[in-house]
């Protein structure tokens, strides 16, 4: 019986490992995985250890927005960003999903510009645009940087080309 349980556990771990490896072979799947990991229900926590594996250790995260009519940006490194994901703000849940995207790839580098919609822990909904930059190294895709901006009129200002499904 013990050997049956042990074999079952090994099989399950092997399947999960294979599924996770597939995520790193496609920039589209890597974007979806990023959003899957940060989308949590009330009472859940984001798996920041796994989230870290999606990104280069040197990745940067930048949010662009307007304040008093002036464009502003805030940029942080991977460790700083992971710390924000453990904030109490997320304790009531968070959800983000892609609406459409443009994917460009060349010679080991790629970019995905994606429109998204989300709902935060306070049930506020919003739409915006993410820009992911990728590099292919060590047999897989890595997210090198991520930049995002929120829409100011519930997505009506998002260019149509970013709303088209791949």
Walk through the language-model features, giving the residues of each.
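Bacterial Sec-dependent N-terminal signal peptides
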Residues: 1-24
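Short, low-complexity N-terminal intrinsically disordered segments enriched in polar/charged residues
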Residues: 18-53, 163-165
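Surface-exposed, charged secondary-structure patches
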Residues: 23, 61, 65, 70-121
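Hydrophobic pocket/interface hotspot
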Residues: 34, 51, 59, 112, ...
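Short beta-strand segments enriched in hydrophobic/aromatic residues
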Residues: 38, 55, 116-118, 147-148
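N-terminal, post-signal-peptide region of Sec/Tat-exported proteins
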Residues: 42-71
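Short beta-strand edge/turn micro-motifs at domain boundaries
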Residues: 129-155
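Short, low-complexity, Pro/Ser/Thr/Gly-rich segments in the mature regions of secreted, periplasmic
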Residues: 152-166
């Amino acid at each position: 019986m013990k050997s049956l349980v042990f074999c079952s556990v090994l099989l399950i771990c092997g399947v999960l490992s294979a599924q996770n490896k597939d995520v790193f072979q496609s920039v589209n799947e890597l974007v979806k995985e990023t959003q899957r990991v940060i989308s949590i229900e009330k009472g859940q926590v984001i798996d920041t250890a796994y989230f870290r594996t999606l990104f280069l250790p040197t990745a940067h995260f930048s949010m662009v927005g307007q304040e008093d009519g002036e464009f502003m940006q805030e940029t942080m490194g991977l460790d700083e960003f992971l710390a924000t994901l453990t904030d109490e703000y997320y304790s009531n849940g968070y959800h983000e999903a892609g609406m459409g995207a443009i994917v460009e790839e060349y010679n080991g580098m790629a970019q995905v510009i994606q429109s998204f919609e989300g709902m935060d822990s306070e049930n506020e909904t919003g739409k915006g645009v993410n820009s992911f930059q990728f590099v292919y190294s060590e047999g897989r895709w890595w997210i090198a940087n991520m930049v995002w901006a929120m829409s100011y009129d519930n997505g009506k200002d998002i260019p149509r080309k970013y709303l088209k499904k791949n």
